Amino acid sequence: MKSKVQKKFFKTTPIALALIVSGYTAAPHAIEFNWGDVEGSFNSQITAGSSWRVEDSDAKNAGVGNGGLPGNTPTGDDGNLNYAKGDAFTQTIKGLHDLGLTYETEEGITFGAFVRGKYWYDYALDKNDVIHGSGTNNYVANQPINNDDFNNLTKSKGVALLDAYIFTGFYLGETAVDLRIGKQVVNWGESSFIQGGINAVNPVDAAAFRRPGAEVKEGLLPVNMIFANVGLTDNLSIEAFYQLEFEPTVIDSCGTYFSTADYLAEGCNTLVVDPNTGLTDKGLYDAGIYATRGTDEMASNDGQFGVAFKYYAESLNATEFGLYYMNYHSRLPYASAEAGLANTLVPGQGYTYGQAISSPFVPVGTDLSGLGTTAEQYNSNYHTVYPEDIQLFGLSFNTTVSEWAVSGEVSHRLDLPLQINGADLLASALTGDPDSPLTPQYKEAAAGSTVDGFDRFDYTQSQLTFIKFFDKALGTDRITAVAELGYGHVWDLPEGDDDIKYGRATVYGKSFDGIGDDDDGFTTSDSAGYRLAVKADYRNVFAGVDLAPSVAWSHDVYGYSPEPQGTFQEGRTGVNLALKANYLNMYSMSVSYTQFGGDFNPLSDRDYVSVAVGISF
């Protein structure tokens, strides 16, 4: 028989909670079939939807040459400037299909396979003109974004295989064993909303989550791995995985609505550099004041593995405890630079870009004098790095207290990379700003060598989650309430005025130029925030129609977490108001409004509304 851990009484995984909050209902009209002794099911979801911007852009979120505030840089504002209030930034039709097959022998051994795939087409991304342009089309305005070189999952149209694995379940004596091999998702830990905890096995597809009517299963990227779950005793089980490949998180592509970096995503190979010229992105590009992307440093396919022990303590209020260890490579990219090649120029003499003959981005005839730059800087380029071998240790629990489901976790990472402030990094590597604390290490680096744009620190994060169901309350069939609190701490982080600064979106400028805000928004030792969500279910309101209004609220109260994850950013807020209608558990329609806030949140002026309709069968 299955161990108590494997058939546990209550378990709210991140996916399960997301389904609760979103109002998702598994398709009851799935096609079920038998092929001899093989049982199968085929599920389909077709969705069409659109999203529109409902707020004007704010000058605080744009580079100074693009109409932004003094001190702001032009390296993270393309997505903001491309869409005016009222513009549709996505108009998508998509399909999601999965096939499951199961076969059980007379001895009770189970074999099976599961495959899931999706396809999509986004008319707005493919055909709609944008106002500002991006580096992918040389900042030519009033034409569609060129997404030809984007990651396949962020393009305007595509087909993708998600899950694809085989599995088996059997007994070794009294020991239950489950094995899965192939592209799959593994969920660990107890976090429901707050990122940066134990649940770090799989990367995320940000573009999928941006599309109207998104499901959690569309946005978690399966990875080829071997996974095993073994019931060691009636109360103790062990889980383990070994990944067979490295897959990065898919971030928002440059120029698209939610992008906050114009140069990091795949296919975004141009970085305009503004050495205090005040030019627009188009002006900088036409003047040749831009850097090109070098060769990205992808992580190895080897060395990612983890093990978890789950113990079910029935005598301790039926509590499950978890103990975790994982070694993984960063799913998120870190900006770094390559030290330039020296030219034989006389110090202190004015030069034109044309004299820096090996520069990849300088036009002939532009005077370099007074910019405080050297030939070495103008031979630099930038690229992204995926740092390897981050070790994670974790503890978790979940139980019930009165009628509340209560869970929590603590995770500790050894050698977590912290992104150096991007504006400081780029100013040092590409313009040689003499005031930057980073410039000396670029000047001292060997020509052609990589100077990492990150330093490593240990990081601890803890979270508590509370879930409560209120049945037949306030005229509803059920109200679901969720609250989650989180706190993070970076160990031994230097925070002096002259120390290197970490984090903060590049659009908000450098930490040392005395223009704009030099002091706030950078990574701090401590940070905290909370998330709240409430959903009401009204069943069969009329003629088989179910209604599910919901509200979700997020608030980062204190401090700034390590970037690029950026779990907590002081003052950052978000609210989502939604109403979903479901007819006969087959047809659905949803309407939502999302609002952002925060002083150092580049999305703070990108409120939007979404509408989606779908069919499940």
For each feature predicted by the language model, list its residue ranges.
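Transmembrane beta-strand segments of Gram-negative outer membrane beta-barrel proteins
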Residues: 33-75, 113-117
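Membrane-embedded beta-strand positions of outer-membrane beta-barrel proteins
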Residues: 42-44, 113-115, 179-181, 228, ...
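Transmembrane beta-strands of outer-membrane beta-barrel pores
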Residues: 48-54, 119-123, 127, 183-187, ...
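Solvent-exposed loop segments that connect transmembrane elements
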Residues: 58-80, 126-150, 202-211, 252-293, ...
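Detector for outer-membrane/organellar transmembrane beta-barrel domains
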Residues: 90-92, 326-328, 333, 407, ...
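Outer membrane beta-barrel
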Residues: 107-262, 529, 558-559, 568-573, ...
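Outer-membrane beta-barrel "beta-signal"
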Residues: 605-617
